[in-house]
């Protein structure tokens, strides 16, 4: 698939996931095995809630956040349209980029890794054939890099570029837990929690999330450079006229 802004799908493809016999893999394996299992005794109540809260279509959360920011900053209709377009164009290219990486590396999900750990050649990882992720069903695509992390890093990068980094109270509503709202003071705080949620949900290794965050930021940075904004100075004369005339 041809990207919208990127020159090619693998432009920012991350390095391969950690080797199965590495110390890094051992650490991330044991982390998700402990924190991400259904009915975990190691995860806190808040970590379990976070894992469930974000277990929906991550782009939808970030569009809600953008709506809050647009209203708080009193953008004109034209400026608001540009903000949403920039955000979702970034998401579109990030989806292309992370699927390119996922199907290049075809790295296993925690549920498969943990159940069949006896085959990984690492004597520091113990198999649990009955292990289930906290969030229930595992996504059908490969694990590395993490989609939530990629999208959230891109969303935070774009919105920080558009609105700046000043504190902004953000209420985010769960896509999957009706009526449950969590509050944040910055785009970066949202990004961090959304990324960590996939570990608590038992869906991803931390290495997936780290790679996703780097990929998402790189794609967003490229998009911003290609389609710069002028929102801070409110000097979009056409947008200001459009807002006043209507």
Language-model features: locations:
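Acidic/polar surface patches and capping/hinge elements
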Residues: 1-235
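Glycine- and aromatic-enriched low-complexity segments, predominantly in secreted/extracellular proteins
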Residues: 234-246
